């Protein structure tokens, strides 16, 4: 009978140890997922994402008057024309344009670049940092008269991929207007990222083309946001029938955050599973401690008669269960590391798996286990030893 009970007890402890492994692993994974999500939301993207409002006009012409009108408001810092925000955010779905140029050796080279439609105020509105050259000169008159020389600004990723020390003044061809015009590089901006940080920043160029600028991007002061939006809406409605009738706006920061909706859903699901795993593990601890104290009531009574303190008896039980947490911690760490290593590998830009996350997972389980064990054993350890022996 004793051997059978011993085997049964060993099996129960083994199952509890497995539950500890699962709980610690999930805690570790949850911590890293939340750390990565925080990293994604706070990483410097090379642009100003806060307080930029985007409005769909439905038309690319008759907007200059509207632009000048809203700039009269001191809370409106900058206004630019551009494409729809989701076009920038989903740029990674496009293959981009193949642009060609002649290098210093007189040989033709080419590079695939993403096109970002912009006007002369785009760099200022989004806070892009101009490293070399000058900004775009958006001249609608010259564009439609056929005298526009198509200046473009490239990002640093494009400059590095072109392997040219100074690209300012270089002519490139291809992309929009293939076979009809050449483009001239007038500036280089620091890399900026509209897309998800799952992918590296791609070579890109900014170019003015009025037909592609159906949205207005407005940089507003952080103070009096609603008041400024009401003012913009009033001026927008005064533009009827040139604009679409419905005034719709979105904040650029909100649109960017939607890039990581998948990660937020994953973090919520993982948190729910982690809580469930911890609860199940603690229920196992609770049940096992209850069974153990009942089986060892006589032992506890004898220890008390021989002078043992209640605290010492509780400590004995705590050390026993902490031992199982420690054993579970050993396989949980490499398991959590492997799972998260493969998950983080999906991101071009990622956080680090800090040592304190591993330690924290083990300490949380150890702490909850201690509270559960103390809560269950203190009552038994504190009762009169005569009563314990009589119970036996």
Feature-to-residue mapping (PLM):
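Alpha-helical transmembrane segments of integral membrane proteins
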Residues: 1-58, 344, 386-392
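Intracellular coupling helices
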Residues: 1-3, 283-324, 378-391
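Membrane-helix entry/capping segments
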Residues: 2-14, 239-276, 295, 340-365
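Hydrophobic alpha-helical transmembrane segments of multi-pass inner-membrane transport and secretion
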Residues: 10-36, 264-298, 326-327, 364-371
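Membrane-proximal extracellular/periplasmic loop immediately following the first transmembrane helix
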Residues: 35-117, 145-147, 211-212
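"Rare, low-scoring activations can occur
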Residues: 67-79, 156-160, 177-267, 344
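Hydrophobic secondary-structure segments that place a key small or acidic residue at a functional site
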Residues: 111-202
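Transmembrane alpha-helical interface segments in multi-pass membrane proteins
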Residues: 277, 298-341, 357-360, 364
């Amino acid at each position: 009978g004793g051997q059978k009970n011993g085997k049964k007890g060993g099996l129960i402890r083994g199952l509890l140890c497995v539950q500890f492994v699962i709980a610690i692993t999930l805690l570790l994974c949850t911590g890293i997922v939340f750390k990565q999500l925080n990293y994604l939301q706070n990483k410097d993207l090379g642009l100003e994402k806060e307080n930029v409002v985007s409005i769909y006009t439905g038309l690319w012409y008759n907007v200059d008057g509207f632009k000048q009108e809203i700039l009269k408001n001191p809370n409106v810092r900058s206004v630019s024309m551009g494409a729809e925000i989701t076009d920038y955010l989903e740029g990674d779905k496009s293959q981009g344009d193949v642009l060609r140029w002649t290098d210093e050796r007189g040989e033709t080279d080419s590079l695939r670049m993403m096109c970002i439609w912009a006007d002369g105020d785009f760099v200022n509105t989004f806070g892009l940092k101009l490293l070399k050259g000058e900004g775009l000169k958006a001249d609608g008159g010259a564009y439609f008269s056929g005298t526009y020389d198509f200046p473009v600004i490239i990002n640093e990723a494009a400059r590095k991929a072109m392997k040219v020390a100074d690209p300012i003044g270089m002519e490139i061809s291809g992309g929009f207007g293939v076979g009809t015009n050449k483009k001239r590089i007038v500036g280089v901006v620091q890399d900026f990222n509209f897309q998800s940080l799952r992918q590296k920043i791609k070579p890109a160029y900014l170019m003015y083309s009025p037909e592609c600028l159906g949205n207005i991007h407005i940089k507003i002061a952080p103070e009096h946001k609603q008041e400024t939006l009401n003012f913009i809406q009033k001026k927008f409605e005064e533009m009827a029938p040139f604009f679409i009738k419905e005034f719709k706006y979105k904040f650029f920061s909100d649109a960017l955050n939607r890039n990581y909706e998948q990660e937020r859903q994953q973090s919520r699901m993982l948190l729910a599973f982690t809580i469930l795993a911890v609860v199940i593990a603690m229920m196992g601890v609770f049940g096992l401690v209850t069974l153990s104290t009942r089986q060892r009531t006589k032992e506890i009574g004898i220890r008390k008669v021989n002078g043992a303190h209640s605290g010492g008896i509780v400590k004995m039980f705590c050390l026993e269960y902490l031992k199982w947490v420690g054993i579970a911690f050993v396989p949980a760490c490499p398991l959590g590391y492997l799972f998260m290593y493969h998950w983080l590998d999906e991101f071009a830009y990622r956080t680090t798996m800090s040592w304190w996350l591993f330690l924290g997972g083990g300490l949380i389980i150890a702490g909850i286990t201690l509270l559960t064990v103390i809560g269950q054993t203190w009552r038994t350890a504190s009762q009169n030893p005569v009563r314990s022996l009589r119970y036996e």
